[in-house]
UniProtKB/Swiss-Prot annotation:
Residues 27-272 form the Deacetylase sirtuin-type domain. Zn(2+) binds at residues 141, 144, 166, 177. This is NAD-dependent protein deacylase sirtuin-6. Induction: By cold. In hepatocytes, expression is increased following incubation in a ketonic medium. It catalyses: N(6)-acetyl-L-lysyl-[protein] + NAD(+) + H2O = 2''-O-acetyl-ADP-D-ribose + nicotinamide + L-lysyl-[protein]; N(6)-tetradecanoyl-L-lysyl-[protein] + NAD(+) + H2O = 2''-O-tetradecanoyl-ADP-D-ribose + nicotinamide + L-lysyl-[protein]; N(6)-hexadecanoyl-L-lysyl-[protein] + NAD(+) + H2O = 2''-O-hexadecanoyl-ADP-D-ribose + nicotinamide + L-lysyl-[protein]; L-lysyl-[protein] + NAD(+) = N(6)-(ADP-D-ribosyl)-L-lysyl-[protein] + nicotinamide + H(+). One of its GO terms (molecular function) is NAD+ binding. The active site is at 133 (proton acceptor). It is found in: Nucleus; Chromosome; Chromosome, Telomere; Endoplasmic reticulum. The modification N6-acetyllysine is found at residue 33.
Amino acid sequence: MSVNYAAGLSPYADKGKCGLPEIFDPPEELERKVWELARLMWQSSSVVFHTGAGISTASGIPDFRGPHGVWTMEERGLAPKFDTTFENARPSKTHMALVQLERMGFLSFLVSQNVDGLHVRSGFPRDKLAELHGNMFVEECPKCKTQYVRDTVVGTMGLKATGRLCTVAKTRGLRACRGELRDTILDWEDSLPDRDLMLADEASRTADLSVTLGTSLQIRPSGNLPLATKRRGGRLVIVNLQPTKHDRQADLRIHGYVDEVMCRLMKHLGLEIPAWDGPCVLDKALPPLPRPVALKAEPPVHLNGAVHVSYKSKPNSPILHRPPKRVKTEAAPS
């Protein structure tokens, strides 16, 4: 649970602004804004999504700065509520929608600040995913950089030794690497993983559309990555119930529950959200499936100029691809 994760971090005074009031767009305005997002995605050649804790609240994992977030409740001297464990949490509709968007070629890369492992367990391809703050289910060998995805949380935090050794053979016929495996969870002062940060930065700089979901964008440098898209002339869409650090930079701000926004988005794109059939780890993305032939018909909603978005006419541009990451997937030894 994020409660245990937060409790495992070192003491840190500046946790950002917590408990800000939530904003809800009226239903017609929300529908129109999601339609605008669908058009932007359809006409963009490279789309990057940036996700935060807000996409996992529907999975029973509390966020940090929301009205009932871990740190918000901590400031009030109250205990946060939680409904599940990391192992029992199920991917939300948003997690599964992102899987389908990648599968259909609408999503080029995914950058996440979440440590709950739900993107990986949902089946999102790891070669198109940067987990900037780590993953509770992943441990890594510091010698050969091989990562192991476990079926339970690894049990430590702060890049500490987990007590297991790397089993990858150095070369054929020689003994195993036997490097001391460590968790991948960052503490406050730890540097972001070089590879994930490099891929996230490259994807953000080359994208013509960045979409943030369920994040207040307060943590640096993760929260500033979407601005790299803006600096290169791309568009920025922010989906969050609370105000974010970069609202003024956004071309479109959508205030609604992320699951509702993603369900509406998938409907406009003519896509179904797949069901989750249990934990599934996909190391490398599959070739994209054919897209629907066109967007669904535009809804007859007019907002008297409340939404202003410009579009680029590049519906058939190529999709950005990323190199695979060396990953070993297995259950943790008992």
